[in-house]
């Protein structure tokens, strides 16, 4: 794995996590 792959994976994980928090927040959980 190179640095670009690791960076891209980290960005996708962070984006998915933040998106999940927004969805859960709007759902009132």
Swiss-Prot record:
Which cellular compartments is it found in?
A: Plastid, Chloroplast thylakoid membrane
Source species, please?
A: Chaetosphaeridium globosum (Charophycean green alga)
GO terms, molecular function = electron transporter, transferring electrons within cytochrome b6/f complex of photosystem II activity
Tell me the membrane topology, using the record's own terms. Single-pass membrane protein
For this chain, the family text in UniProt reads: Belongs to the PetN family.
Q: What is this protein called?
A: Cytochrome b6-f complex subunit 8
- Subunit (UniProt): The 4 large subunits of the cytochrome b6-f complex are cytochrome b6, subunit IV (17 kDa polypeptide, PetD), cytochrome f and the Rieske protein, while the 4 small subunits are PetG, PetL, PetM and PetN. The complex functions as a dimer.
- Which gene is transcribed and translated to give this protein? petN
> Main localisation, per the record?
plastid
């Amino acid at each position: 794995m190179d640095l670009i792959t690791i960076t891209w994976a980290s960005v996708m994980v962070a984006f998915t996590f933040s998106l999940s928090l927004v969805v859960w927040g709007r759902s009132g959980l």
